[in-house]
Amino acid sequence: MRYLSEIKNKQITVLGLGVTGLGIVRFLVSQGLTPTVVDSRINPPGIDWLKQNTPTLTTRFGDLDSADLCASDMIIISPGLSLTIPAIAKAINAGVEVIGDVELFARINTKPVVAVTGSNGKSTVVTLAQQVLLAAGYKAALGGNIGTAVLDLLQSDLSNNDVDVYVLELSSFQLDTTTSLQPISATVLNVSEDHLDRYASYQAYIDSKLSIYNNAALVITNADDEATHSKAKSQLSFGANQGDYSLGEYQQQTYFMQANKAFLPVTSLAVVGKHNYLNALAVMALLSPFNISKAQYSTAFSQFNGLAHRCQFVAERAGVKYFNDSKATNVGATIAAIDSLATNGQQLIVIAGGDAKGADLNALTPYLQQHVKALICFGKDAKDLMALTNKSHLTNNMSEAVTLAKQLSEPGNIVLLAPACASIDMYNNYMQRGDDFIQCVMAEQP
C-alpha cells in the first residue's frame, strides 16, 4: 500500500478502456487516485461505467496523438496496445514510465503468486492448479489473462483478506510491461509461433515469454521443449518421458511420476489425452512449493472436466466422435490436439482455417500425413493450409465444413475442429467459432 501513497500525486494515464483498462480505473479510484483515461476509440466499451461512476475524471477519447501522453508521469497500458504505436513510443522515448496492470499488481501485492505462460495450455493449467490448491485448503484466486483482472482480485483481497495465493495466467503482451513480479513458481509451458503480427521476430516472442522466469523463486521448464529452458539455479522440469515430473509405466498402468516414482495413475484425471497429462504434470511441478497430499491431488484431478473449446468432446454421431478445439489458434496447439487424439491410430478429419497471423504452417505437415484422413479448410488463410497436403478440401464456412466432414467420415473416425489460426477473420473470438462448430454438429442428422 505504501507504493500507492508514493504515486498519489503523480499524473497517471490509463491507456485503453476495455476490460483491463476499466479494471485499472476501478482500482485506482478505489484507492483515492484520479487518473486521466485515454482511448483511441471515440466510444470505448467502458465509457458508460465512467459516466455513471466517475464523471469527474478527465477523459480523452479519439486520436492518441492529441492526447499528449508525454505529459504523464506514468502510463498504465492495456495489453492489447503495442508499445510500438507512435504516440506510445514517443512517450517512452520522452522518459514516461509505461507499465501494465500486472506490474501495478506486483508492486502492491504481498501474497505468493504462481505464474503461467506459454503458447498453449495456459488456461487449463491455471484452472487445474487453482482446483488443486482449493482441494488442499488454500484460498486460491485465479485471474490475469483468464477470468478476473488481477487488480480486481487484489482489490477484493485488500478489502476482505480472502487470498492465500494467486494463480495467474499471463500473456506475452502482459509480460512485456511487467518487471517486478516475483512468483513463487513460474513456467513457460511451451512455445510455438504466434502473434508474429505483433513481434519483430519469433525470437522476440520467445524472449517475451521467458521473461516470466525473471525474479521467480522456482522455474518450471518443459523438458520436451528447448525453447522453454532456463539457466536458473532453482528449477524443475516436466515432460512426457523425461523431467522431474513425467509419465511412466507402473503395475501395467501409465502413471504420473515424481522423481521417477509412481505418484498417481493418469486415470485419476477426469480428462484424457496426452496434452492433458502434460498439463497435470506442469501443475504438479508448479505446486511443489505447497503442502499438498496425494489424496488432495486425486480429489482435484477427478473433479476436473476440462475447459470449453479445448479438445472438448461435443457428440458421437454414427460412430464418429466430434471434438471442439477452437482455442487451437496456432500450429502448436493443433499439433497437440492431433497428437493427443490419434494415440490409438484413429484417423482424423481436421477442420482448420482463419487468420494465421503470418505464422509458418509447415510444422503441421508430418502430422497431417500420418494421422489425418482429410483436412477441411475455410477462412482467410485456407489456401495456405491446403498447400500442406493433397488430402485437403476447401469450403466457405463452418456449416459447409461440418457437412463435408460428415460425408467423408466413417465409424471410428474423429472430426476435430483445430483451426491453427485466429478467428478474427470470420468471428468475434474463438468461443464464437467453437459455438458455431457445436451448433453445426448438433444440427446434422445422426
Curated annotation (Swiss-Prot):
GO terms for biological process: cell division; cell wall organization; peptidoglycan biosynthetic process; regulation of cell shape. It is found in: Cytoplasm. Its main location: cytoplasm. GO terms for molecular function: ATP binding; UDP-N-acetylmuramoylalanine-D-glutamate ligase activity. One of its GO terms (cellular component) is cytoplasm. Its EC number is 6.3.2.9. It comes from the Bacteria. It is an enzyme of class 6 (ligase). The keyword Membrane does not apply. Pathway: Cell wall biogenesis; peptidoglycan biosynthesis. Keywords: ATP-binding, Cell cycle, Cell division, Cell shape, Cell wall biogenesis/degradation, Cytoplasm, Ligase, Nucleotide-binding, Peptidoglycan synthesis. Coiled coil: none annotated. The keyword Disulfide bond does not apply. It catalyses: UDP-N-acetyl-alpha-D-muramoyl-L-alanine + D-glutamate + ATP = UDP-N-acetyl-alpha-D-muramoyl-L-alanyl-D-glutamate + ADP + phosphate + H(+). SUPFAM superfamilies: MurCD N-terminal domain (SSF51984), MurD-like peptide ligases, catalytic domain (SSF53623), MurD-like peptide ligases, peptide-binding domain (SSF53244). ATP binds at residues 118-124. Cell wall formation. Catalyzes the addition of glutamate to the nucleotide precursor UDP-N-acetylmuramoyl-L-alanine (UMA). Belongs to the MurCDEF family. This is UDP-N-acetylmuramoylalanine--D-glutamate ligase. It comes from Pseudoalteromonas translucida (strain TAC 125).
